[in-house]
Regions:
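Active-site residues of response regulator receiver
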Residues: 52, 82
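Charged docking surfaces used in two-component/phosphorelay signaling
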Residues: 15-23
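Acidic catalytic/metal-coordinating carboxylates
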Residues: 33-36, 59-65
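Alpha4 helix (beta4-alpha4-beta5 surface) of REC/receiver domains from two-component response regulators
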Residues: 18, 62, 85-101, 113
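Acidic, metal-coordinating helix/loop segments flanking the phosphotransfer/catalytic sites
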Residues: 30-48
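C-terminal output helix
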Residues: 106-115
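The feature encodes the CheY-like receiver
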Residues: 14, 56, 74, 86, ...
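Conserved acidic carboxylate
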Residues: 8
Length: 129
């Protein structure tokens, strides 16, 4: 069982993610904005973060950058969930150090597989040592 922080401002989607991940055996902590999300990450040292790019207070890009610049959080895998599946978004999140980008709506099986893949291959993010 992994501890996962989910940061998503769409509360119905956030609840759906919580149900899917808990059903897959994970401990799930949720946050509806970036400030609460950062607090949850710092307080709980999760194994993985699911992050919507469009959350209040900090956008997802700023959030990834903040996570990668903090020694306590830099090696936590971040999977980005977004409705923006364009090449520019994909390139930018990967350059910032996100492990994966999944486009909404995401199928449950694909999400679980992506999470399991990241949990099975945790390693430091390049250039962020």
């Amino acid at each position: 069982m992994a501890k996962i922080v989910v940061i998503e401002d769409d509360l119905s989607f956030l609840d759906l993610l919580r149900v899917h991940l808990a059903g897959a055996g994970h401990e799930v902590l949720t946050a509806g904005d970036a400030v609460l999300g950062l607090r949850a990450v710092i307080a709980n040292a999760p194994d993985l973060i699911l992050l919507d790019l469009s959350v209040p207070y900090l956008d997802g890009f700023e959030m990834i950058e903040a996570l990668r610049n903090d020694p306590a959080t830099r090696n936590i895998p971040v999977i980005v969930l977004t409705g923006r599946g364009d090449d520019e978004t994909y390139t930018r999140v990967h350059k910032l150090g996100a492990a994966r980008l999944l486009t909404k709506p995401v199928q449950r099986d694909l999400l679980i597989k992506a999470i399991e893949g990241q949990l099975g291959s945790r390693q430091p993010h390049p250039g962020k040592e």
